[in-house]
Amino acid sequence: MKLTVWTYEGPPHVGAMRVATGMKGLHYVLHAPQGDTYADLLFTMIERRDHRPPVTYTTFQARDLGSDTADLFKQTLQDAYDRFQPEALIVGASCTAELIQDDPGGMSETMGIPIPVIPLELPSYQRKENFGADETFFQIVRTLAKPMARTKQITCNLIGPTALGFRHRDDITELTGLLSDMGISVNVVAPMDATPTDIARIGAAHFNVLMYPETAETAARWMERELGQPYTKTVPIGVGATRDFIAEVAQIAGVAPYLDDSRLRLPWYSRSVDSTYLTGKRVFLFGDGTHVIAAARIARDEMGFEVVGLGCYNREMARPVRALARDFGIEALITDDYLEVESRIEALQPEMILGTQMERHIGKRLGIPCAVISAPVHVQDFPARYSPQMGVEGANVIFDTWVHPLVMGLEEHLLHMFRDDFEFHDAAGPSHHGGHSPKPQAAEPAPQAAPQPENTGTSVEVVWLADAERELKKIPFFVRGKARRNTETFASERGVGEISVDTLYEAKAHYAR
C-alpha cells in the first residue's frame, strides 16, 4: 500500500459494490470501519444514481476493537435481512476489516438466514477493484445458476456491465438492438439490472456475450464449462470490431450475419479529404485493457493515427496489452501509478491523449488535448443522453469524442496566438469600441541573456528564453511538441545552452531541408 492522491482502481470491495449496486434484490453486508462508507459517493455523486448502493456497513469504531466485533457483524447481518428482505445476500470485509480476521463468510453460514448468503474472499492487499467485481459476479453465478433447458428461440446473455462502468447502460441498449436485428433475443443482462432470480435462469440462453472481460470473464469461463454456453471473445468497440463481433455471433448462433450500418457515420469521414488533417497524428492510449485494445485498433486502422504509446492499469490484462504493443512496435506501460503515466506522456509528447479522467488532468497540465476512453471517469462521462461506446452508434460517439478536441483546438490556438495582438489583447476592450479604447502601454522588452558560444563537444542541457517560449506558443498545438523536441535536439547537438527565437527558426530551417 502507498499514499497517493489518485488511484485508478479502488480496493476489491468497491468492485463488489459495483456488482451489488448494479443488481436488484441483492444486498451487500460489508464488515467495515466508519471511514469506509465513502464509497456511497461514487454512485450517488459521480454516477448520479437516484438511490444509494444496497450496502449495509457494520461501521465499527476504534472503541469496538476492545470488544467482540464478530457479534457486531452478526447483528448487522440480521438487521439487514429483516429490514430489506433481499432475495440473496453477499457478505465480505473491507480492506481495513480484513486485518481483524473476523471471517464474515464463516459467521454468516451459522446464522440460518433462509436465503442464499454468498461469502466473498477478496484479498484487499493483493488485488483491486476489477478483480473484486469479477470475483463477486463469479461467486453469485456459481451459487445461483444451474443447468436447464435452452429457450426455444435463440437467446443470449449480456454479461459484464456493472454500476460505475464507462457507458455500460448505453452499451446494453446498443448491443440489444444489434442482436435483435439478427433475430437473437436477450435472456438476461447481468449484473446490471439483474435479480438473483434472473441469475438462476441464466443457463437457459444458448450463449453469452462477454461485454467487459475485466468484470465477467471468470463467470463466462465457468458457464462455458458448467452450463455448456460458449461466449464471445470480440468486444464490439469500433467499426471493424463490431463487424467481427457480428460474424462471431452468427457463427456461434448458426444464423446469417447482419449489420445495419445505415447509421454509421465514421467511414465516410475516413474517406474524405478532411480526414487527412488527422492522418499521422501521434496518440498515447491508457486505461483498462479492454478499452485500450479496442481504441488502439480504431486509432490506427479507422482514424489513421500513429499510436506512439499505450498501456493499462489493470495487471490482469497485461499479457494481451503487451502483445498488442509488440504488434505496434512499441513498449506497453503496465502501471497503476499516474506519475509514471505522466512521465511517459511527457517524454513522448503526443499530439493527443486517449485515457481516463487522470489523463484528462495530465493533458491539461501538459497542454495536450485528451479524450476519455475508459473508466475511471468523472461525472461528465455519465451523460443523461444516449452515448454508447459499442456498436454502430458507439463508433459515431467515439468519432465525435476523439475528433472534437483536435478540431476545436484549432480555434483555441488562434485565440491564444492573437492574445498579445495590439487589437485583441486583454486590455484593449471590446473590438467594436476600438476607437475609444485606451492606448496600451508598451511593455518593457525582456532582457535577453547573451547567447552561449557554440560548442562542438557533448550535448548540454538547454533552457528556453522567455521570448522563444512565447514564439513557440504561436505554433499550432498539434505540432508544438514536435517543434519543441526538434529545437532542443538542434540546440543540444550544437552546444547551445539557451534557446532564443533565432535558435527556434534556425532549427525549423534545418529540419525543413
Curated annotation (Swiss-Prot):
UniProt key word Oxidoreductase: yes
GO BP terms in the entry: light-independent bacteriochlorophyll biosynthetic process; photosynthesis, dark reaction
EC number: 1.3.7.7
PANTHER family: LIGHT-INDEPENDENT PROTOCHLOROPHYLLIDE REDUCTASE SUBUNIT B (PTHR33712:SF7)
Region (Disordered): 426-457
GO MF, one annotated term: oxidoreductase activity, acting on iron-sulfur proteins as donors
Cofactor list: [4Fe-4S] cluster
This protein's name: Light-independent protochlorophyllide reductase subunit B
Comp. bias (Low complexity): 440-454
Subunit-level organization: Protochlorophyllide reductase is composed of three subunits; BchL, BchN and BchB. Forms a heterotetramer of two BchB and two BchN subunits.
Enzyme class: oxidoreductase
UniProt: substrate binding residues: 409-410
Cofactor binding note: Binds 1 [4Fe-4S] cluster per heterodimer. The cluster is bound at the heterodimer interface by residues from both subunits.
Keywords, in A-Z order: 4Fe-4S, ATP-binding, Bacteriochlorophyll biosynthesis, Chlorophyll biosynthesis, Iron, Iron-sulfur, Metal-binding, Nucleotide-binding, Oxidoreductase, Photosynthesis
Pathway: Porphyrin-containing compound metabolism; bacteriochlorophyll biosynthesis (light-independent)
Catalytic reactions of this protein: chlorophyllide a + oxidized 2[4Fe-4S]-[ferredoxin] + 2 ADP + 2 phosphate = protochlorophyllide a + reduced 2[4Fe-4S]-[ferredoxin] + 2 ATP + 2 H2O
Organism, scientific name: Roseobacter denitrificans (strain ATCC 33942 / OCh 114) (Erythrobacter sp. (strain OCh 114))
UniProt record similarity statement: Belongs to the ChlB/BchB/BchZ family.
Entry binding sites for [4Fe-4S] cluster: 36
Function: Component of the dark-operative protochlorophyllide reductase (DPOR) that uses Mg-ATP and reduced ferredoxin to reduce ring D of protochlorophyllide (Pchlide) to form chlorophyllide a (Chlide). This reaction is light-independent. The NB-protein (BchN-BchB) is the catalytic component of the complex.
Highest rank taxon of the organism: Bacteria
HAMAP family: ChlB_BchB
Active site (catalytic residues): 274
